[in-house]
A protein has these predicted regions:
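Extracellular/periplasmic catalytic domains that process cell-envelope and extracellular macromolecules
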Residues: 67-68, 91-95, 105, 122, ...
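Extracellular glycan-associated modules
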Residues: 126, 406-721
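Active-site histidine-acidic residue metal-binding/catalytic motifs
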Residues: 26-31, 110-112, 253, 274, ...
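Primarily short, surface-exposed interaction patches in extracytoplasmic proteins
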Residues: 157-193, 197-232, 246-293, 354, ...
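Extended surface/linker regions that mediate inter-domain or inter-protein docking
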Residues: 219-357, 363-364, 368, 517, ...
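Bacterial N-terminal signal peptides
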Residues: 13-22
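Solvent-exposed helix-loop boundary motif
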Residues: 25-167, 171-172, 188-193, 203-205, ...
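N-terminal secretory signal peptides that target proteins for export/translocation
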Residues: 1-7
Length: 827
């Protein structure tokens, strides 16, 4: 008793000292404030008593957001910002008198928060802040940013109630607030609670009867094991996780088209039923494509990052929505794994939490390197890349078998090409005869020729026909042609209204078909990503087909199923000149690789940059797509692309074979062979003669090539109907990330690089600066948030409400945990 009295006297003494300290700054506090101070706990805790008030009523003007900060005063950290007039740094204790004056003032011009803020402090809140100042105004890191402090429980602590550690913390809180625990639940209630908690379904009557008749602890544990091993357990847990991951069966936005992410959903169900560890569960969803020996299942998990809404409206700007998708991934990462509202920092520094706008875009850079363009790509069997082929085991076996056959056949072809020297030398021994054969053979495989020399007006005077240069070939249809001097005679020029379309069956090739295109073009200036021609669908449907662009006057040719992920692409290293005619030839060998694509400029092979290099499905037009038609080979205005305005086009030839270099040299200059004969320099071109012979005149090689192409077609038939799932996959070359002014995609500012908010935990420089490194950062033992967020979410899953009720927000604006010690102990 004597000790208690001494302790009480000591507290009274401290309390008096506290008020002497406060009153030294102000003559007298209002009586109502003093009364409220007397009702407060002996010690006011910054995180649990003071910070919620400051966050709600003060941080908007005196918090982390430097652009909105008033009076150069910060109340979210233990110092005032450096004064504009001197280098002095002031703490709250240094300005305590002014702060208390403003909190208690009745003068509207003096009072804080100001009346027009419409969030005033009540007397208890003012008293809390004043008492905290009197105690020394000590700041502490935000409760969720500090390392969990784990209480080591003794056997005596665990002896309460059922004997587990959770009950110790519950009992401690109930005793503190003077509440007795509820009576023990009946067996009927227990089994019902357990069944709903672990299966989401009521127990069966048989299970209820069996448990009522034997309600022992052993029987209860057996029920737990039974329910945890039930497939329903994974379904229940996945259902809750799907909400975290923003799962939906449609795209959202205006069109709201159907989509199928059920393979990812099934992966989540299996992960819970297999009791996958949480670090693996998260790492596979964030970066399953980047882990060592990534397989179909680990890549499938990354669909988590592609569950954002997807816009397929006609007028969207792709980069705008690509930026939206990156922001969505970043925001979801924050809410799902950090319990933070990162979206506030997309446009400005967070007003309540220490997350700057730069922090947001540094985090976003982890998700900004995905191989995507922002296009919807919603044609049948198409999806915006990156995507994963969802092959069955049987399909995998068939694909593997065909690929092995293709590899074997390719080796045979290489061997045969090397061994054909004897036949070639015999043919080469008579060069003039060989030249005649080349000239004659060049016309083989020519399936279309349009010289654009003759134009015949139709009834309305605006539409014209241009006759083909081959018998039996229908003429080209042209709207408002501009006719000028061409490569040979006349040429077709393009204005805003010019549209040229070939008959729909002309130039129709699949990705397994070899073909060549020869033509001349006259660029009239510099072109930024202008489409010269296209035998393809709209970019919204993946540029399905083939197309030619001028990108800063470099030639870019694309063959695609769904561009850019299911496509091959080449671009010349040099530009082609403007203001003059240039002869162009494009060849493709039908093998689905960028290495089989080549561009020739004025008869010479052009150095090119190859990309994409994965073309694994058919590029043929599907007539059942939505309401859009297919116009075949077209020149003129194209959807979503700049037009080849004022540009000329002439002498179009289409071949159903790969033209060899010597054939292309002859097509470019019909005097080529005459000069060879005159100058007798055949030997200089012997390799070109040999290539022609091997590709066209060696019957054994032709048979092997036909066998190879047949296998390729069979492989495409197997792969074509296989569904695909949107997943993650990074570009080989990192995409630059910038802070976006007010979050606007078209207003980049400072360039930033992959990093994490320093207020949470610095990013270890040893970690890879990609999504895998980000996942490893999440599970760093020093990370204060990861475990807390997941424990709180699991608690919510089973009890309906988390230990802190704002499961996705453990920041300053989030609810405080009801049982902070329990949350830390479980974490």
């Amino acid at each position: 008793m004597e000790k208690y009295c001494l302790h009480k006297k000591y507290l009274v003494f401290c309390f008096l000292i506290c008020f002497i300290f406060i009153f030294s700054c102000q003559e007298k506090l209002p009586t109502v404030i003093v009364e409220n101070i007397n009702k407060l706990p002996e010690t006011v805790d910054f995180n649990f008593h003071v910070k919620p008030i400051l966050s709600d009523k003060c941080f908007a003007c005196h918090g982390p957001d430097s652009k909105k900060r008033k009076a150069n005063l910060r109340l979210d950290i233990d110092k005032r910002a450096i004064s504009k007039t001197n280098e002095e740094t002031l703490t709250i204790k240094d300005i305590k008198s002014s702060l208390i004056d403003r909190l208690t003032s009745d003068d509207p011009a003096m009072k804080m928060p100001p009346p027009d803020f419409h969030l005033s402090l009540d007397n208890k809140e003012i008293a809390t802040i004043i008492k905290w100042i009197g105690q020394g105004a000590e700041y502490h890191p935000h409760w969720s940013f500090s390392t969990p402090v784990v209480k080591q429980l003794t056997s005596e602590d665990k002896s309460q109630w059922s004997g587990n550690g959770i009950d110790y913390f519950i009992k401690k809180k109930l005793e503190k607030i003077g509440v007795n625990p509820a009576i023990k639940a009946s067996p009927q209630t227990l089994i019902r609670r357990l069944s709903f908690s672990l299966k989401g379904l009521p127990p069966s009557l048989i299970e209820v009867d069996k448990f009522i008749n034997s309600p022992s602890s052993g029987a209860y544990k057996s029920l737990i094991d039974k329910y945890l091993n039930s497939p329903r357990y994974g379904e229940l847990m996945a259902n809750i996780w799907m909400d975290v991951a923003r799962y939906a069966d449609s795209d959202g936005y205006l069109d709201d088209k159907h989509r199928d992410f059920s393979p990812w959903r099934d992966w989540v169900i299996k992960a819970f039923n297999d009791n996958m560890t949480y670090d693996k569960f998260v790492t596979h969803q964030l970066a399953g494509d980047l882990i060592k020996d990534a397989d179909q299942e680990s890549i499938k998990a990354t669909a988590f990052n592609r569950l954002h809404k997807k816009n397929s409206e006609a007028g969207i700007i792709f980069e705008e929505y690509r930026s939206e998708y990156v922001a969505d991934r970043t925001i979801t990462f924050g809410s799902a794994f950090l319990g933070m509202t990162l979206e506030c920092a997309r446009c400005h520094d967070h007003k309540y939490d220490p997350i700057s706008q730069k922090n947001f875009y540094e985090l976003a850079s982890f998700f900004n390197n995905t191989f995507e363009i922002g296009s919807a790509v919603y044609g049948p069997g198409q999806s915006p890349g990156p995507s994963l082929l969802l092959t069955s085991k049987k399909e995998q076996e068939v694909i593997k078998y065909i690929e092995e056959e293709l590899e074997s056949k390719q080796k045979e072809i290489k061997v045969e090409k090397k061994s054909s020297n004897k036949l070639f030398e015999s043919w080469w021994s008579e060069p003039k005869k060989a030249i005649s054969e080349i000239i004659k053979h060049t016309e083989n495989g020519l399936v279309a020729y349009y010289p654009f020399d003759n134009f015949y007006p139709q009834a309305n005077g605006k539409n014209f026909k241009s006759t083909a240069g081959l018998k039996g070939l229908k003429p080209a249809s042209i709207k408002e042609p501009q006719v000028k001097k061409g490569w040979k005679n006349q040429g077709l020029f393009v204005n805003e209204f010019t549209e040229m379309a070939l008959p729909k069956n002309v130039g129709r090739f699949d990705q397994t078909d070899p073909f060549s295109l020869s033509f001349s073009m006259f660029p009239d200036g510099q072109y930024e990503d202008a489409m010269v021609f296209g035998h393809c669908e709209q970019i919204r449907i993946g540029l399905k087909g083939y197309s030619l662009f001028l990108n800063k006057n470099k030639l870019k040719f694309i063959i695609a199923r769904s561009w850019p992920q299911n496509a091959i692409e080449i671009e010349t290293e040099s530009t082609i000149p403007s203001g003059k005619w240039t002869s162009i030839t494009i060849t493709y060998d039908g093998k689905g690789l960028a290495s089989g694509l080549n561009l020739f400029v004025n008869g010479e092979k052009a150095p090119v940059k190859r990309s994409g290099d994965q073309l694994y499905k058919s590029i043929l037009f599907n007539p059942n797509i939505h309401t859009y038609g297919f116009d075949g080979f077209r020149i003129g205005p194209q959807h979503k692309f700049k037009t080849y305005l004022k540009g000329g086009f002439d002498e179009l030839k289409i071949y159903s074979k790969v033209l060899t270099e010597i054939e292309i040299a002859y097509l470019n200059d019909e005097t080529f062979f005459d000069r060879l004969k005159k100058e007798k320099v055949y030997v200089n071109f012997k390799p070109l003669f040999r290539d022609f012979f091997v590709e066209n005149l060696d019957n054994k090689i032709k048979k092997l090539e036909n066998d190879f192409n047949r296998l390729r077609k069979n492989l495409t038939k197997v792969i074509d109907p296989i569904p695909e799932l949107m997943v993650m996959g990074d570009r080989s070359e990192a995409r630059p990330t910038h802070v976006l002014n007010r979050g606007v995609y078209s207003e980049p500012r400072e360039e930033v690089f992959p990093n994490t908010p320093e207020a949470i935990l610095n990013f270890d420089s040893k970690l890879p600066k990609n999504r895998l490194g980000l996942a490893q950062w999440l599970f760093d033992k020093k990370n204060p948030l990861t475990a807390r967020v997941f424990v709180n979410r699991i608690w919510q899953m089973h009890f309906g409400k988390g230990l802190t009720s704002t499961t996705d927000d453990l920041g300053s604006q989030g609810a405080l945990p009801n049982y902070p010690e329990l949350l830390d102990w479980l974490s």
